[in-house]
Amino acid sequence: MTKAGSKGGNLRDKLDGNELDLSLSDLNEVPVKELAALPKATVLDLSCNKLSTLPSDFCGLTHLVKLDLSKNKLQQLPADFGRLVNLQHLDLLNNRLVTLPVSFAQLKNLKWLDLKDNPLDPVLAKVAGDCLDEKQCKQCANKVLQHMKAVQADQERERQRRLEVEREAEKKREAKQQAKEAKERELRKREKAEEKERRRKEYDAQKASKREQEKKPKKEANQAPKSKSGSRPRKPPPRKHTRSWAVLKVLLLLLLLCVAGGLVVCRVTGLHQQPLCTSVNTIYDNAVQGLRHHEILQWVLQTDSQQ
């Protein structure tokens, strides 16, 4: 790359008063460091070179009052171009500019501007006008500054709107996060209360079980003497042998019937002379005589009469 220092010698040699002419120097880049060392050079001519860009530190040359960048290949100006607040005269004729940086609105001292022969944005081209003479170039400077201030204001409003949207979104996120945290705190609080209630119930149940176990031996101890000192259960009175007596009576009745039948046969019929009947009659007479004095028979007869 060709620099002014190497092609044109020392810059101080080219300084004429406050004017520094570096035009037609076949420059591909601006010697910013060397220019910064010459604050006296308030008028700088860089026209008719091969500059396609300006470095960002070029905007630090705030001592510049008049700047000629015409007939180069500039496609854009640095974003901080507005730092050149002392600039009054700016020639950008015949470059490749489409737009200007928003900071251009900060060039409050700009009185003269030429933007002819640039592929400007249609809106900016209409604002800049033709700039065919001194008057039109002054009007161009004023109108372009007003336009860039409006663009800057629009961008600032848009920036503020985006910031507001971001703030609202942040507030919503914070509110959502706070609601989530509050919900989590409430959930933890409820779980803690439920756990405490569960433990309390377990504690009460353990105490109740312990009291019940302590009461049990006392109850058994109180019931033990009662079982010893209490009267024995009374045995049910012996049941009367009604059925046995009935069977006995039936047997006796059958026996009596048999005996009576035999007696009748032996006493009434003509068989009483038979040896068997004689024996039967004798036994009968003896039995009747003995039974009349027998205590068992008397007891049976008495029992029967009582029933």
UniProtKB/Swiss-Prot annotation:
The chain crosses the membrane at residues 245-265. The modification N6-succinyllysine is found at residue 73. Residues 148-216 form a coiled coil. Residues 229-241 have a biased composition (Basic residues). The modification Phosphoserine is found at residues 23, 25. It is found in: Microsome membrane; Endoplasmic reticulum membrane; Nucleus envelope. PROSITE patterns: LRR. LRR repeats lie at residues 10-31, 40-62, 63-84, 86-107, 109-128. Residues 150-241 are annotated as: Disordered. It comes from the Eukaryota. The modification N6-acetyllysine is found at residue 135. The modification N-acetylmethionine is found at residue 1. Can form homodimers. Interacts with SGO1. Interacts with FGF1. This is Leucine-rich repeat-containing protein 59. The gene is Lrrc59.
